[in-house]
Amino acid sequence: MLSRRTKTIVVCTLVCMARLNVYVPDELAERARARGLNVSALTQAAISAELENSATDAWLEGLEPRSTGARHDDVLGAIDAARDEFEA
């Protein structure tokens, strides 16, 4: 939309979001208010992180275990050698 008076463009974006009730202890809510935290953004980030972690866990559980025949100590030694090489 173009404003005739100021000749600037005004953009309006509609975002549909569900409204949820989140219950936290009174003391935690007070501390969040005192710090000026955006509880909505923090809640969104926490839910997103949990969903991503759950998806990763589900993917890992779906993998078939395969033995490479490599011993754990040999793998750790190879990783240490690679780190040393890249740090040099």
Swiss-Prot record:
Cross-referenced InterPro entries: Post-segregation_anti-tox_CcdA
Keywords attached to this entry: Toxin-antitoxin system
Lipid metabolism keyword on record: no
Name recorded for this polypeptide: Antitoxin VapB3
GO biological process, one term: negative regulation of growth
Domain of life: Bacteria
Induction data: Induced during infection of mouse macrophages. Induced in persister cells in response to D-cycloserine.
Entry's transmembrane regions: none
Lineage summary: Bacteria, Bacillati, Actinomycetota, Actinomycetes, Mycobacteriales
Role according to the record: Antitoxin component of a type II toxin-antitoxin (TA) system. Upon expression in M.smegmatis neutralizes the effect of cognate toxin VapC3.
Keyword Kinase: no
Origin species: Mycobacterium tuberculosis (strain ATCC 25618 / H37Rv)
